[in-house]
Amino acid sequence: MRKFFGTDGIRGIVNEILTPELAYKLSRAIIGYFKDVKKKKVIIGSDTRNSKDMLKSALIAGFTSGGMDILDVGVVSTPSLSYLVKKYDDVLLGIMISASHNPVEYNGIKIFKSDGFKLEDNVEATIEEYILREDDYFRASPREIGVIYNFTQALEDYKNYLKEIIGEDFRGYKIMLDCAFGSLSEIAPTVFKELGAEVIAYNTNYNGININDNCGAVYPEIGRNLFLKSGAHIGFTYDGDGDRVIAFSEDGEIVDGDVLIGIFAKYLKERGLLRGNKIVGTVMTNLGLEEYLKRLGIGLIRAKVGDRYVLEEILKNNLNLGGETSGHIILFDYMPTGDGLLTSLFLLKILKERGIKLSDLAKEIRIFPQVHEKIHIKDIYITEEDEKEFRGIAEEVINGKNIRYIVRKSGTEPVIRITVEGDVPKEDLTNIALEIKNRIIDFLRRSKRQDLPSKGVS
């Protein structure tokens, strides 16, 4: 089991798990791993958390001590950093300091290669070994120590790239944006305005501690209330680092990632642009989307949860569309990672081209009810045998009913996530999910003897 890297880089509570010492050791370990590579520049960006400067300083100290120059792009979205790393030929890596949708107590470090993709699992594992080894890796001579460059103007390249992809004038559209006090707080309203839309933007005045605080893509019901108040034609709510988005149709309905993928799949197929006639979802992808795709003659490949695993399947099967219920959508012809701003622009492009409302497209996809529960498991190591036991508990509770379930340990938080789904009343699913949750808590209490929350409390 890995000590530092999860499904999306290194992530944890700041100054408990993710410390400046760890950030420094990480950059020194990267110096050791890439010691024979001639490229000597690293792009560093972050979301808006107050811990960004502390972690950035530690990373920069490690990189510059090894002779790496730093291109500091400031506050950026994760997908924009991925784009910039690929665009500039002399850049070795991109470092994104962000914990995505997590609250401000968390932060994370994501590493991108020069092709814009995240590091492979085996490379992360080797770098982790280097961290634990604590060797004093290469140090540059005084004349060769790296320097820091302000590179914030590079965001203009990303902005222009998005506008080039869309190629539309959105005059006449009134757009609501919930920017979650995160990375898209400035650039998202600007891009929509430059394309002619009238923009009503909420949650843009970030202060370092309000990122994702009862706002953004993790809280779509709150975003829906903002949308209804705004009087806009369509709304979008992003997460803290801008790699996911949830939409709101003109009638106030929440349009999640599964529905967005269905809309994009149909649009691309009708134009002969859907590569392989398949798309990639995850184990969480709603059965309603799967049935809709079948009617269109489109296949669905289910990956593990996490946009990196969606991308793996896209690459393995030579496809160009994939995503998650949470709103990570990969439009691979344009971007190798989920991009909330690109996704929202692309959706509006479709609506304008077709002269149609979002509700008209969304209602074609009947999403089955889902219920989610979670169990906090701080400091509890979950084994494969435990996970097998969880599945057995779920199957016993469901008892042959036509209900799909997923029980899994989160790759980004210390929780076990439980999802049940089926074409049955939501109340039935809620009862089943709670029963599974309570039985798993009982099992963990017996087997791990840990102080877990009481029954029914997540």
Curated annotation (Swiss-Prot):
Its cofactor is Mg(2+). It comes from the Bacteria. Catalyzes the conversion of glucosamine-6-phosphate to glucosamine-1-phosphate. The lineage of its organism: Bacteria, Pseudomonadati, Dictyoglomota, Dictyoglomia, Dictyoglomales. Belongs to the phosphohexose mutase family. The active site is at 100 (phosphoserine intermediate). This is Phosphoglucosamine mutase. It catalyses: alpha-D-glucosamine 1-phosphate = D-glucosamine 6-phosphate. The keyword Phosphoprotein applies. Its EC number is 5.4.2.10. The modification Phosphoserine is found at residue 100.
